[in-house]
């Protein structure tokens, strides 16, 4: 693959990942759909897209072969809090919290597994953690605490999902299976919400936004990312993901009309700088885990 094509595919995938935050906030922030229905439609649409791509790749439906409940459970544990968080916080804040928590969880997992971080990695961890903590300090501009907590839970779950799927021979098929088997969990959640709030009725616009989030920015976005990934070094792939919260923030301002506070800017600089330091230090180590964005 040429360098130009790799760059184009990488940029397209990163924009897709950032767009998940924008689409979810656009749908839920304007009350076009309830969070449970958005989650269910997103997972079902993602499953259909990924299954079609995987089947076309293998020219069979053998992609559904495979066991394990950890992937579907982790995916659902990410998708549901992700949606409910965007009832309370903006896309820019949500993308930053998600990115920061995913990276910190992955790094923490490495340390728990025996990695011995040097001074540069510890400095990066402190900076990133400080940036996330800054978002929770009480003030007039503080994001909704419950929304931040829900997104943090989503971040931990996505990190677990990434760790469960690492080293998979066919990542598109593995993602397809996880989306397929997580969808019933989301449908149960919908039934619970309907039981509690029978008046909830998704609008056509809300349904379309959920379908696009599932089929295009999730399903197709992952496929594009995995197409570009073999042509990227581990460091290039990791550093490229630093742009996702920035793209989401720019989109939140341009598309959603969100105001970016000085608190968010400072928190963003701390988180991205901290993660950047960690990635720079880990690039010199023999083994570095790859992760994917939501």
Question: Residue locations for each model-derived region?
Answer:
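Glycine-/small-residue-enriched transmembrane alpha-helix faces in small-molecule transporters
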Residues: 1-40, 73, 77-81, 130, ...
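Membrane-interface interhelical linkers
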Residues: 1-15, 46-70, 113-122, 140-146, ...
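Specific transmembrane alpha-helical segments of multi-pass solute transporters/efflux pumps
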Residues: 16, 57-99, 107, 127-134, ...
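Hydrophobic/aromatic residues within transmembrane alpha-helices
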Residues: 27, 38, 42, 85, ...
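Transmembrane alpha-helices of multi-pass small-molecule transport proteins
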Residues: 31-77, 101-109, 157-161, 178-194, ...
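Specific alpha-helical transmembrane segments that line the substrate/conduction pathway
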Residues: 37-48, 75-76, 83-116, 154, ...
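Hydrophobic transmembrane alpha-helices of multi-pass small-molecule transport proteins
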Residues: 50, 54, 75, 117-137, ...
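Helix-helix packing/entry segments at the starts of transmembrane helices
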Residues: 94-101, 165-184, 218-254
